[in-house]
């Protein structure tokens, strides 16, 4: 049985070509391994940088930030995924990827972080990248780390 998902999607960006709520829901659900209550918020650079500075003590604009709340109820994972629209747009352009593919990747990447995946060392990065690629393949999206 698929994990239960309670999802809120917030658009706080002036970008034109944002994914739909339905697309975001599909990407989140595909990456989910546990019942969860998640907010995905798409923001502009100022908000992403302010959050990165306030919560990670890093003064740059990230592509995605994840705020894990752990179990907010028995067996219910909680957290926020914040995606910076201008950075995702720039990276997609620089990498020659369709914008929707890169939004899917950043969404999946953030949801995996909520579930404990990371890329601190090579073994963890390989595990996370393999999982990302398998999820994205379901949407006919090529491996995000291979050209």
Curated annotation (Swiss-Prot):
Record function comment: Single strand-specific metallo-endoribonuclease involved in late-stage 70S ribosome quality control and in maturation of the 3' terminus of the 16S rRNA.
Binding note for cofactor: Binds 1 zinc ion.
Domain of life: Bacteria
GO CC term, one of those recorded: cytoplasm
UniProt entry keywords in alphabetical sequence: Cytoplasm, Endonuclease, Hydrolase, Metal-binding, Nuclease, Ribosome biogenesis, rRNA processing, Zinc
Source organism (scientific name): Thiobacillus denitrificans (strain ATCC 25259 / T1)
SUPFAM superfamilies: Metalloproteases ('zincins'), catalytic domain
Matches recorded under PROSITE patterns: UPF0054 (PS01306)
Record has Metal-binding as a keyword: yes
Cofactors named for this entry: Zn(2+)
Localization, UniProt: Cytoplasm
InterPro entries: MetalPrtase_cat_dom_sf_prd, YbeY, YbeY_CS
Residue numbers binding Zn(2+): 109, 113, 119
Chief localisation class: cytoplasm
Pfam families: YbeY
EC number annotated for this UniProt entry: 3.1.-.-
Name the record gives this protein: Endoribonuclease YbeY
Family: Belongs to the endoribonuclease YbeY family.
GO molecular function annotations of the record: metalloendopeptidase activity; RNA endonuclease activity; zinc ion binding
């Amino acid at each position: 049985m698929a994990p239960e998902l309670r999802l809120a999607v917030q658009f706080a960006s002036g970008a034109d070509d944002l994914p739909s709520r339905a697309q975001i829901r599909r990407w989140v659900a595909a990456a989910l391994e546990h019942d969860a209550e998640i907010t995905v918020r798409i923001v502009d650079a100022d908000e992403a940088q302010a959050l990165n500075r306030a919560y990670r003590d890093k003064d740059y604009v990230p592509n995605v930030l994840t705020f894990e709340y752990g179990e907010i109820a028995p067996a219910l994972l909680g957290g926020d995924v914040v995606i910076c629209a201008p950075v995702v747009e720039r990276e997609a352009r620089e990498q020659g990827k369709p914008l929707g593919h890169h939004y899917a990747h950043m969404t999946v990447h953030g949801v995996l972080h909520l579930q404990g995946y990371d890329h601190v060392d090579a073994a963890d990065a390989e595990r996370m990248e393999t999982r990302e690629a398998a999820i994205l393949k379901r949407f006919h999206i090529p491996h995000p780390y291979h050209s």
